[in-house]
């Protein structure tokens, strides 16, 4: 699965270059595309540029997974800890 197949209405021009080490874990039942860093469990949510799906959040949200399965890797259920959020992509990648 990729964000392009799971969110076909997400404008490709609005998707920033995701940093190395992040894998696309987007799933259509989530509010927007997401990427996970398997080594650290950091999750990066990238919301639509207009009319965002993430309520009460900035366009770019960084969270950390707290539940890791030996079979399936990091799991979103079991809790996500908010790390940082911003509407400025440069602040996320700094």
PLM feature segments, named:
Residues 1-40:
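Negatively charged, low-complexity tracts enriched in Asp/Glu with abundant Ser/Thr
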């Amino acid at each position: 699965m990729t964000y392009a197949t799971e969110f076909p209405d997400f404008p490709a021009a609005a998707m920033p270059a995701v940093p190395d080490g992040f894998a696309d874990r987007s799933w259509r039942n989530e509010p927007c595309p997401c990427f996970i860093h398997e080594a650290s469990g950091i999750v990066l949510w990238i919301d639509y540029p207009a009319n965002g799906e993430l309520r009460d959040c900035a366009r770019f949200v960084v969270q950390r997974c707290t539940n890791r399965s030996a079979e399936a890797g990091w799991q979103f259920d079991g809790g996500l800890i908010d790390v940082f959020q911003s509407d400025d992509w440069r602040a996320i990648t700094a």
